[in-house]
Amino acid sequence: MLFAACAFKVRQMKLCKAIYLFLGVLSIQASADRLYFNDLPTPKSLDDLRAIQEAMQSNLSRARGATVCLQIGEGSGSGVIVSPEGLVLTAAHVTGGVGEEVTVVMEDGTEYQGVSLGLNAKTDAAMLKITESGPFPFVEYDKNDATRLGDWVFSLGHSGGYDKARGINVRIGRLVREAETTIQSDCMLIGGDSGGPLFDMTGKVIGIHSRVGASKEESMHVPLREFQAHWEKLEKSDFVGEGPFAKKPVPGSGFLGMMVEDSLEKKGLRVTELWEKGPAEKAGIKVGDLILEVEGGSATKELLKSTLGQLGSGQKILIKWTGGEETKEKDVKLEDRP
């Protein structure tokens, strides 16, 4: 029994030593990964300034290649690609909703089509996906929340929209404040930068531009931890939270803008009236056309009414119709009632 007890204590001591050694290695690794100038209150020499400059420049090309301009309707913002398949992080107030069609403009002007995924209306976090085939240039994002106040950072964005001649705007600064759902830097941001990336000096995305404070030097960003907290929901196109950055669709508020009646000669609904410049007319539906399907089901007044009763302004309804010999199918975006 005495021998067994001693052997157990020896194993305990070895295990503790192994754990301490492992934690020590992690600590050393973390220290090794941390750039020394982040811990200086201010740069003390020309060498310090050169080190900051070289760190940013070594990561700038890749960062620029993954930073995109997002064109949604008549507005534009910025975003950053974080996967070769084309997953983009941006701000909720840029996408404005779930399922929005987006034109994604690369640094060289190449355009791809995409669709907005989920968003968090409380924190201003949002995702979208490029729907065309990749691979696309991308950058890594911070998964460990390793940045600290005072760390040097740089921001990228398409200020005022895409401008090939000007290129992407780059600003350098430091983290100056941190709150639960926001980090603040002194990188100057203006309109069009919203949704763009904030990088640490190792080239990882640590935040997404949200808004400007009392002055242009007080820039607010959504930290990556806020994306990670709801990552799966955002990827699944969920509308998360309630807040000022996006308006949640109210069921039954969506307006299609057409009147129909049961067709006597063929199965479906005959269009009898259209609201001028309404959603149905914009989609190409004409008076006299025959609605064949609503959301994949045979078109009836009951199905159309019940489906619209579940959808709000900004959401889409799948309509299949025929006009003469041509059959069309389209997601029609609903609007506010006039």
Task: Give names to the regions the model predicted.
Residues 34-60, 102, 136, 159-162, ...:
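C-terminal cap/linker of serine protease catalytic domains
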Residues 53-57, 66-85, 110-113, 138-140, ...:
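A conserved glycine-rich beta-strand in the N-terminal activation segment of trypsin-fold
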Residues 76, 83-125, 130-135:
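Catalytic-histidine neighborhood of serine endopeptidases
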Residues 80-81, 188-209:
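Catalytic nucleophile loop of clan PA
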Residues 85-89, 206, 280-303:
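Conserved PDZ fold ligand-binding element
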Residues 137-182, 190, 212-220:
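Flexible, gly/ser-rich surface segments that form the specificity/activation loops bordering the active-site cleft
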Residues 194-197, 264-265, 275-290:
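PDZ/PDZ-like domain micro-motif
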Residues 239-242, 286, 292-293, 305-338:
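PDZ-domain C-terminal substructure recognizer with occasional recognition of PDZ-binding tails
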